[in-house]
Amino acid sequence: MDMKQMLKIELERAFKGTGFKISILIGMVISVLQFVKCVVPAAMNPLYVLKGRTIEIPSNINNIWMAMNPNVYYELYIRLLPIIVVIPYAITYYTDNKKGIVKNYYSRTKKINYIIAKYIAVFLTGGVTATIPLIINLMAASAVLPAIIAPIDSMPCNANGMWSYIYFTHPYIYYVMYLILQFICAGLLATISLIVSLYVNNAFIVLLFPAVLCEFMNAVTGWSHYRVVKGMAPWRMFSINQLAINYWQSYVLYILIILILGAVMYVWRGVKNDIV
């Protein structure tokens, strides 16, 4: 069995599994609630305005859809994201080893084929589950609300934030760019469970470790005097609205660190130390 066949098997297992459906359901419940509670009332009343701002403007897509409307729904979504991305498939490397399924694969293909295919499947499911609810919410809100490019003081995005110049001129390009970035970061976050799988002997630790790590990072990075380190707090990195400024250097560090850890602690050790 070559890499292409192995990858096909892993992707089918990942995207047809119950875990993937559960993650999408969790994200969609939050997305739909936000749409019903925030978007629909604004769409029902065209003269609705946002109160308490320096400049009041009619509600529109750029300050009402879930990712740009700072409220409990988006906050909950960000906090649950580390769990949402791992539920679909991140724990299966651990369970495959425990159930002996991996022995069947190793008898039919090279270890590296299985390990890389698993990594890609986990990465893709994590990215998809993190972005699909946001994309659907954006599309639904766009169907019922106007798209107004408003003055800086009336929009949630920090004027000094990353790509803010794009947001205040071409907001949809900004959304696409940030959703792609979120896809990558969420996918990599899910792969942390693969790394942990080689070092622990408990399924719940494998499942919950990314969430615990994110909360730990949220606390610890706040102690730093360096803005790039502060910017690596997950609650900031996954916040598209940038109420706290994001920095491109923080994303580069985040991506490089997880890629290096994945290459060394998962791929290299997986190939060397897995014993059939």
Regions found by a protein language model. Name each.
Residues M1-G27:
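Aromatic- and glycine-rich beta-strand/loop motifs that create alpha-glucan
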Residues E10, I255-V276:
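Junction motif at the cytosolic side of a transmembrane helix
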Residues G19, K110-I112, I116, N202-I205, ...:
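Membrane-helix interface segments
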Residues S23-I30, A203-M217:
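Central hydrophobic cores of alpha-helical transmembrane segments
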Residues M28-Y89, Y119-A190, L194, L198, ...:
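Secretory targeting signals
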Residues P88-T125:
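Helix-loop-helix units of permease transmembrane domains in multi-pass membrane transporters
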Residues I195-N202, G270-I275:
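Membrane-interface helix-boundary motifs at transmembrane edges
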